[in-house]
């Protein structure tokens, strides 16, 4: 199968040019002017549009069981939504398994979840929910099987203490894996939460007040120091929500420490005032939404290169689940927001179209750097001969208002309802196959492939 994309502006992280792009058998074969491929081929006219590498979202939670509820997106509805939003690769954070389970247990469970449902290519992050000799011995074998990143939690039920974190950091570093971490100070959160509950203060706004930015920033600083103690182990901070944590990361980077950081559209575009609305429970996530000042600090990091990746942390619970389980108490509400379908459009509209970032920086944040950090480059995140034919075409002339009824996930609401975006996703191709076109999903469940990722190699800081 041959596909020729003509008349568009092809953009990679290192530059852009108005040129044609030829995909053959799912692989980019040629870029240039006036390409004349052998017949037969499909021709796509991208006049006036940007032709970007397909998005790489390295932070999703599909089919996750958090104990009190299971998220309402599985690997079909979740990857369908991703495809319709221009994302062609996801790396899903595996959920916790039974007490004492091995790493392989969760890998086998999640490969079963995705195998016949995923629309786009996928991989997983391992999750380390406890430390013992068996887990430490298992890590190199899992890396050899293509999982080269693992997540640690400093909060929630399976949080690790500092000694366990050090053991994990050392072993992951030795094994060629990147450590990712959810950084919040669990003890401080528990203390604040208990105070509010004892006082009968359980409305959504107290979720944010119980998890102040200092809880997140302290944990970031602690992880930076522990990574240094563990032999300068590489570290990736997920879902950054505040400027103080970013300051600590800037300092570490200035000291040539191998640390990277992601943020998410919700921390760039939503703020804590959402908790005081009638539907405040729909915005419960951790870390919580912050104020506009923190948004501005994050946008500075987006613009100046201090932030490396924009992912989603897509974790969908319906309003029915939230209301039934929480019964008006923020501490009982399942955490997470939908967003995998909106990431590319939101960042393009609020970043590129406002002049905050260039189209090249957009590629860096949404596909190139995620692919580099997580062992997928140059197969993903790049439009060049030999790379996968993963493409998203965005028309900057079109304006769209986000409405839940037009989205493709399995949620019953969107936190982005009513947002007007300048720029529309008009087509998504995965390995040369159109899976979304002009508002219509055309992919199929099970066509996505499991990606064996290479061991971690740090990009140049």
From Swiss-Prot:
It is an enzyme of class 3 (hydrolase). Binds 2 divalent metal cations per subunit. Can use zinc, nickel, cobalt or manganese. InterPro entries: Amidohydro-rel, D_phenylhydantoinase, Hydantoinase/dihydroPyrase, Metal-dep_hydrolase_composite, Metal_Hydrolase, Metallo-dep_Hydrolases_sf. One of its GO terms (cellular component) is cytosol. A divalent metal cation 2 binds at residues 151, 182, 239. It comes from the Bacteria. Pfam families: Amidohydro_1. Optimum pH is 8-8.5. Homotetramer. Catalyzes the stereospecific hydrolysis of the cyclic amide bond of D-hydantoin derivatives with an aromatic side chains at the 5'-position. Has no activity on dihydropyrimidines. The physiological function is unknown. This is D-phenylhydantoinase.
